[in-house]
Design a protein with these regions (language model features):
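Extended amphipathic, helix-rich lipid-handling scaffolds
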Residues: 1-17, 21-25, 41-109, 120-152, ...
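Extended intrinsically disordered, low-complexity coil regions enriched in Ser, Thr, Gly, Ala
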Residues: 114-118
Length: 198
């Protein structure tokens, strides 16, 4: 984890300006810029952006025990992540968090089994909402697409209110069961055949 930054602190106004900076993580790089108002409730105005030609950006946020599993798959695509953090951040205040992320023209390939998912894409969004608490959090994935060896997958998902989750999911999928078993390296599944349509 490395941070390359240029900071400018104005003692009169109490504003710390973060000039365009780089955050280097093991699997991804991000750009950070914005300001922190130290005299006004530690008011944040931050922008974090990242683009990558593969899924490493999402692997960077995965739980440590899941990373070796994800690393088994060859992958590429146009991946982006844009986050804005705005508002007071001290004395019990939580800033507004608004994140947009997604992928297009992507693929995942299990090279050991020669199984590949093509034409993957999705648009994602997360916010902690106007009240900046669990009850106003929203997470969505829209325009989820994927072309399987034999079949396809289309879908969307919306989760509202993380205290009492309301989930709205739509799927239109048609795929070969044996393909999924091989692609995911499922070991304890035998004699799989047939199609699944949702």
């Amino acid at each position: 984890f490395e941070v390359h930054t240029d900071l400018d602190f104005n003692e009169t106004t109490g504003v710390l300006e973060i000039k365009p900076s780089g955050i280097v993580m093991e699997y991804s790089d991000f750009e950070l810029e914005g300001s922190l108002d130290t005299k006004n409730n530690m008011d944040l105005d931050l922008s974090i952006k990242g683009t990558k030609p593969n899924f490493d950006m999402f692997i960077a946020f995965a739980p440590a025990n899941l990373i070796p599993v994800l690393e088994r798959y060859k992958n590429a695509g146009k991946i982006y992540f844009n986050a804005n953090i705005n508002g007071p951040s001290n004395k019990g205040n939580v800033p507004l968090i608004d994140v947009h992320f997604g992928a297009s023209k992507a693929f995942l390939e299990n090279t050991a089994k020669a199984k590949r998912i093509d034409e993957m894409g999705f648009k994602g969004h997360f916010t902690n909402g106007h009240k900046r608490r669990m009850s106003t959090m929203e997470f969505s994935l829209s325009n989820i697409t994927a072309k399987l060896e034999e079949g396809s997958f289309l879908g969307s998902m919306m989760i509202k209110n993380f205290e009492e989750p309301e989930v709205d999911m739509k799927l239109d999928a048609d795929f070969d069961l044996d393909f999924i078993v091989k692609f995911l390296n499922l070991k304890n599944v035998d004699n799989t055949s047939g199609n699944i349509s949702l």
